[in-house]
């Protein structure tokens, strides 16, 4: 449910995934506040998410965007898709993603779609299992994307050439 997208001067795409009103009950009544979940990416393999809380919606969104910019990770992409199928989990949410052919598009729902789009993934097949809580789905998706290894990374780790491991 990506509701809003902006492009900053430093070419970061920002998406607002969810805004939630929460309340704290005190002796005098309820204190309302808001939470915002956002993702930020450069469209070329860098992505981060942020979760902000404040008494007003704009302040919560601004805090979430700042946290997202500070918590960016780099993922290995293969011409707009993934190098290999990958699974991720966080809490009760599980996600599965696999590379797709050119022209397939982003087959993903809700929060996972927002993360993949700002990360620069253009062709992917994905499925979310278990809890569909947006925060857990975003964390599981980013965990899975961080686990993607390029052939160059695998070759370097094994001390072989790329040609040797691709056989």
UniProtKB/Swiss-Prot annotation:
Disulfide bonds: none annotated. Coiled coil: none annotated. Residues 12-75 form the S5 DRBM domain. SUPFAM superfamilies: dsRNA-binding domain-like, Ribosomal protein S5 domain 2-like. The N-terminal domain interacts with the head of the 30S subunit; the C-terminal domain interacts with the body and contacts protein S4. The interaction surface between S4 and S5 is involved in control of translational fidelity. Belongs to the universal ribosomal protein uS5 family. This is Small ribosomal subunit protein uS5. It comes from Vibrio vulnificus (strain YJ016).
């Amino acid at each position: 449910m990506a509701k809003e997208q902006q492009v900053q001067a430093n070419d970061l795409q920002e998406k607002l995934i969810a805004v939630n009103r929460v309340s704290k009950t005190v002796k005098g009544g309820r204190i309302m506040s808001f939470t915002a979940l956002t993702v930020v990416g450069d469209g070329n393999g860098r992505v981060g998410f942020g979760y902000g809380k404040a008494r007003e919606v704009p302040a919560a969104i601004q805090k979430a965007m700042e946290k997202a910019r500070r918590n960016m990770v780099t993922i290995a992409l293969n011409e707009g898709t993934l190098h290999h199928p990958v699974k991720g989990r966080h809490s009760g949410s599980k996600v599965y993603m696999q590379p797709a052919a050119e022209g397939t598009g982003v087959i993903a729902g809700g929060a996972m779609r927002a993360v993949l789009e700002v990360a620069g993934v253009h062709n992917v097949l994905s499925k979310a299992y278990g809890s569909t809580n947006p925060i857990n789905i975003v964390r599981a998706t980013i965990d899975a994307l961080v686990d993607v290894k390029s052939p160059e990374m695998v070759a370097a780790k094994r001390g072989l050439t790329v040609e040797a491991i691709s056989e």
